[in-house]
Regions:
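Generic structural signal for well-ordered, non-membrane alpha-helical segments
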Residues: 32, 36, 60, 64, ...
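Functionally engaged cysteine thiol sites
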Residues: 46-49, 97, 105, 276, ...
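Residues forming the flavin
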Residues: 1-37, 42, 120-379
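Immediate flanking context of iron-sulfur cluster ligation sites
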Residues: 32-53, 76-100
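Iron-sulfur cluster-binding cysteine motifs and their immediate structural context
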Residues: 48-73, 94-123, 170, 174-177, ...
Length: 379
């Protein structure tokens, strides 16, 4: 524990976000960087609890109190070593993880939690800047060949671990970019794609082979897969959308998020869609159905494309600002969350059930819905 009184002396201060009036005109990431003093102050707030519940919240089991201690001491390389012992890609999780560790932080019982996610991002960014994160090719090879099907975060992590164990690893990706939803789903304003490309380039230097446009079972048979590799690791992503089977669903103008977001990400990589297939919010009145993170990603993208107005509708009731009694710490808090996209504008509404869409000549004009009331079930 670096500073026993740190949590009493310093408050939670995340990195400052860029002004909304500036950032809605570009796709650059939201946040400014901390100074050394600011970062160390945030690290000092960690209490190094006897039972660190942040470990329970973190799916990776990150050794959070230890890297917070090193950050407070200004020992950034040591902090990085601790972080990399459990997390293959802290530069990803430090940007887009929902941070369940913070929800489980003991400080959050009656105060604001430690800024764990932002500390993680700062450690990894400094690691790359200082040259501490570098290729780690295996010293010996086993002679075994492994195929990893899918190049999202789980596929990349599996490939890195298998390669470091000495196996010859080939990652097969059906899309045109390595990275899965990191490249084609998450908007650039949350995860700059140079961050993903930097990691992929480093993994190539470690000896991992990447192949795009390989769709197993479509243009690459299972027989070929089984015949060419000693082992196969399936890490396919979750790109199958949940549809809304209501009248008018097939009208032109009703789209899945995974039809909309990847197009914009490809545009930023210099690949424009076919004019007949292009989806843009420019000058349009937009409705987003779904109040979660994906909906917020669509909201931020619509702002940047120049939408006239954006409404985001959620079927469930508006969450409370603070934890209700039936949602105690250290459970994940079911509370109202305001993302950077919500700060930028748009209107949110709750208890909205979509009944149908209507339009003229096959083009969407109206959404028809009702307001619902949620009541406890009879017991």
């Amino acid at each position: 524990m670096g500073k026993p009184t740190g949590f009493m002396e310093s408050g939670r201060t995340p990195p400052e976000r860029r002004a909304t009036t500036e950032r809605i005109y570009d796709y650059n990431e939201y946040y400014h960087r901390w100074s050394d003093t600011e970062a160390q102050e945030q690290g000092s707030r960690c209490m190094d609890c006897a039972v660190p519940f942040c470990h329970m919240g973190c799916p990776l089991g990150n050794v959070i109190p230890e890297f917070n201690h090193h950050v407070y001491k200004g020992e950034w390389e040591k902090a990085l070593k601790v972080l990399l012992s459990t997390n293959n890609f802290p530069e990803f999780t430090g940007r887009i993880c929902p941070a369940p560790c913070e929800a489980s932080c003991v400080l959050s019982i009656n105060s604001d939690p430690v800024t764990i996610e932002y500390i993680e991002k700062e450690i990894s960014d400094r690691g790359f800047e200082q040259g501490w994160i570098k290729p780690e090719p295996p010293t010996t090879r086993t002679g075994k060949k492994v195929a990893v099907v899918g190049s999202g975060p789980s596929g990349l992590a599996a490939a890195q671990q298998l390669n470091r164990a000495g196996h010859k690893v080939t990652v097969l990706e059906r899309a045109d970019y390595i990275g899965g939803l990191l490249m084609l789903g998450i908007p650039d304003f949350k995860l700059d794609k140079t961050v993903v490309k930097r990691r992929v380039a480093l993994m190539e230097k470690e000896g991992i082979e990447f192949k795009t446009g390989v769709n197993v079972g479509v243009n690459f048979s299972v027989t070929e897969l089984l015949g060419n590799y000693d082992a196969i690791c399936l890490t396919g992503g979750s790109t199958e959308a949940r549809d809304l089977p209501v009248p008018g669903r097939d009208l032109d103008g009703v789209h899945f998020a995974m039809e909309y977001l990847p197009q914009q990400n490809r545009r930023l990589q210099g690949v424009d869609p076919n004019a007949n297939d292009a989806i843009t919010a420019e000058g349009k009145r937009v409705v987003i159905l779904g109040g979660g993170d994906t909906g917020a990603d669509c909201l931020g993208t619509a702002h940047r494309q120049g939408a006239e107005i954006v409404h985001q509708y959620e079927l469930l009731p508006e969450p409370p600002v603070e934890r209700p009694e039936n949602n105690p710490w250290p459970q994940w808090p079911s509370i109202l969350r305001t993302s950077g996209a919500h700060e930028e504008g748009g209107l949110r509404d709750y208890n909205i059930l979509t009944k149908s869409f209507s339009g003229t000549d096959g083009k969407l004009e109206k959404l028809h819905g009702v307001r619902v009331e949620w009541t406890p079930a009879d017991t």
